[in-house]
Amino acid sequence: HMLIMGPPGSGKTMIARRLPTILPPLSPKESLEVTSIYSISGRLGKDAGLITERPFLSPHHTISPQALCGGGKVPRPGLLSLGHRGVLFLDELPEFKRQTLDLLRQPMEDKEIRIARSSGFFTYPADVMVVGAMNPCPCGYYPDRNKCRCTPFEIRRYLSNISGPVLDRIDICVEASRVELSQLKMKKGGESSQSMRRRVMAARRGQEERYAGTPIRFTADLE
């Protein structure tokens, strides 16, 4: 799981949207899992085949708990399960209701979500990469005091909407800096998504070899 913090225009959303392009392709087993979830949720077309691309979902900050986690009279998967094996991007993270964000705690830890109903318990897979993006303060320009007019109290209140237990489950925190127009105009060769994906896949193979013969596949699975 990852949190990207930076001022407006620093590329937070672009970074998040590029993640599926550098992640390894879905394996046949993963593809079947994702397709099954979309099938039982009624989101798979009649003649649709297997889903072969990793899901990327970006809900609005007003999303309801049921839409996020799943539920209903006849329980259906929510976005946490529909994003299984993919990315769930929460833009403007502190704008989400704190109660909604706290619902992420169990699935971020257990990679599945359990829904209790009078008829019993329902468990859906939710092995999704949760990626949050946020400004450092309500106006977005802290610590630049030439632009930021937020008081210390306003900044603390803004940041406190994300609880400690949710932050504890974030593996990587990235600080994105604002890029000046003059820098954008400079033509520099960057690394392509294909090149990054090859490096990610090489690292993944290394972890699979390291944990061969154990129930663990990747370092992220360690308790």
Task: Name each model feature, range by range.
Residues 7-8, 46-51, 212-221:
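Short coil/turn segments at secondary-structure boundaries
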